[in-house]
Amino acid sequence: WDKITSDSSESCLLNRATQGLYPPGSTYKVLTALEYMEEHPNSYKNFSYECDGQTIVNSVRISCYENEEHGEVDLDRAFAKSCNTAFVTLGSKLDIKNFVSLNKKCLFNQEIPFDLAVKKSRFELTQNSDKSEIPQTVIGQGNTLMTPFHNALLMCAVANEGTLMKPYVVDHVEGADGTTVKETIPEIYADLMSEKDAKKLQKMLREVVTSGTGYNLDTDLYTAAGKTGTAENEGKYAHAWFVGYSNVEDPDLVVC
């Protein structure tokens, strides 16, 4: 029983969407970017960084994927290209107290109300953490773990201009004659970010698809926005992520 319900490749009965906990990799940069914009509302556009593929921050060596050199990047470009070195540079200067508060607000270490059991995502950085933990954390590595369900909910909030609706499974129940006997009424669960910041993230997520790492989704068949991620897995196969939404003008579907 443990073999088929534990989090391993042979676990055929594990609901990975709600029960699997994985390092989010670069999909976590959504929150790092959000915190940076909240702390620098009038100057975040002035961020500039020269990427040569690797850097050392707080005695930790960080490289971009395959040591790719992105050259000079601003925040939007660093996000679209998923530039690790740019993000650890800006992330190392964040107000840790505010950053911890943002992660709590965005459902880390929290019970998520849902019809199915959901494991708590883990965010372990605190004001007392060693500074060497910060570089890995801000790019979605280190001790941070998320369920795909949680990651999808964060994207729902971004697509919905900052407001997260309470998730549910059953839309309505019908009687034998086809009439609706019970209906789930959508309700607001929480405002995770301001509408202004959500719209900034929407633009950045769109650029991931049109000119960044999510280019495979750039098609005439539909429009999409989102964030890619690759998380190291202790010498095993890496965890590959994509979280995003379709129909960018009027978002209708979030996937993770």
Describe these PLM feature segments.
Residues 1-26, 31-256:
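Beta-lactam-recognizing serine transpeptidase/beta-lactamase-like catalytic domain environment
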